[in-house]
Amino acid sequence: MAELNEILGNERIKEHFITAVRHKNISHAYIMEGDKGSGKKMLAEAFAKILQCEGREITGLVESCGKCESCIQMEHHDHPDVIWVSHEKPNVISVGEIREQIVNTVEIMPYKGPYKIYIVDEAEKMNAAAQNAILKTIEEPPEYAVIFLLTTNRGAFLDTILSRCILLATRPVPGTAVEKYLVEKCSVSKEEAEFAAGFSLGNIGKAEAIVSSEEFRDLKDLTLSILRYIHEIESYEIADKVKEYKKYKNRIDDFFDIFLMWFRDICY
């Protein structure tokens, strides 16, 4: 897992966390909003690693040491006091799941760390009953409890939850930084990196996903081959190529995004 200072972009969120650690002013509840792939999980996990680090108490630094038992457990995603809340149904987090995984366990002291940290990904999927269940914990948390609600849409939360959480929003990473990262870390060509940076609109997770996807690469090549030579090829050839899109029916949004990006580049 990445250290906080290794995460690309979102400097304001990283500085917020560093300042909170430096001044020992950790909130009990955070809402982190951003698109899928924008780094919410990485940021929450890196902050959790700093909070649980045993070596930090010795060094006095505001970053994790990477060597203590807590840091090693975080690296292996098995720290007993960092709980990722799961849900069975894909589109809803139920009141039962919130009660079982948070409400009924939060009063149990941390096993070893100074904090007991709960991370709820896709938290916008909590139904009203689940939100009301977690609200009491947010309102009256144990001193050691920290809750992260990661979401693509803060508007899905009750006003009472919004008013009691620190609100943080991820931001797009500059295109040049994304390109540099992809070339250096993912070993792709400058041309591929430039396309991925533009296509992802600064979403580093999305950019990484598309440069590593052979299916996306094939879809991109097919789409661009039509767009680049549409004025030269016959109508029956276009029809044949369109038939090839059947195997990409689950990536129709990507097709339209490639299409729009092509015309955006032409116009601007």
What are the functions of these language-model segments?
Residues 2-129:
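Clamp-loader machinery-focused feature within the broader ASCE/P-loop NTPase space
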Residues 132-149:
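Conserved catalytic/switch belt of AAA+ P-loop NTPases
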Residues 1-50, 58, 73, 143-145, ...:
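Charged, glycine-rich active-site and insertion segments that engage polyanionic ligands
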Residues 122, 149-154:
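A short beta-strand-to-loop transition that corresponds to the Sensor-1 phosphate-sensing loop
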